[in-house]
Amino acid sequence: MKPSQRLYVATALDQDGPVALDTGQAHYLAHVLRLPVGAAVLLFNGRDGEWLAHLTQVGKKGAEAVCVEQTRAQTPVCDLDLLFAPVKGDRTDTIVEKATELGVARIRPVLTERTIVRKLNLERLRSRAAEASEQCGTLFVPEVFDAVSLMSPLDPKAEPRLILFADEAGDAMSVAEALADKPARVALLTGPEGGFTPAEREKLRASPLVRPVNLGPRILRADTATFAGLTLIQSTWGDWT
């Protein structure tokens, strides 16, 4: 039977290995999809590739599966980070979901002077990332970190990484120009509703780790800028090329 569901699990996956599914997954399989024992599912954990598995238990007491064969080997993750200022409503959730679909490895919220949303539900955001990975077919789930100050990624002690700063004001190069030297590690930085303050822009532009980039002739909403920037990076430098 062709698998109808793809699930992210935290446990190791190997031939004939049993896998216990969490209570949410068990409920979904049993009561929403109504899958019987023996039904096929696909499992992945971000380390061991993707596996075809058969359900050996599904019901009120939970769900378990056993791995039958590997369907895809694990592939390297594009070393791309997203640094973004959280936004109001459910748009932060959407940013996490779409960034996952667009292939980022790590999602790092940053707090700017104009950031309105300063407390995040990390459990929910990590769940959104896992669900997006299940749906889009990727073999990994990006890490979602707690929010840090805007200037934390510029700390000399931090891992060196080229940061493309989506600058809505002032002179800035294209994404293709910024990535012409093919850096090993890249991050996209997008701002809050209302944009960065002049002081923040000045500090960012002064850093040797930062290259200001423009995302076209129109002013974009904070979430739209994130999607546009990641798309340009992936098509120019990332795993779309």
Segments the model singles out, each with a brief description of its role:
Residues 1-72, 123:
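N-terminal positively charged helical leader segments and presequences
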Residues 6, 18, 40, 62-64, ...:
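Structural motif
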Residues 40, 91, 193-197, 218, ...:
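Gly/Ser/Thr-rich beta-alpha loop segments that engage phosphate groups in nucleotides
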Residues 70-165:
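RNA substrate-binding interface of SAM-dependent RNA methyltransferases
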Residues 157, 163-203, 209-214:
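Active-site/ligand-binding-proximal alpha/beta "capping" segment
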Residues 198-241:
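Structured adenosyl-cofactor binding patch, chiefly the S-adenosyl-L-methionine
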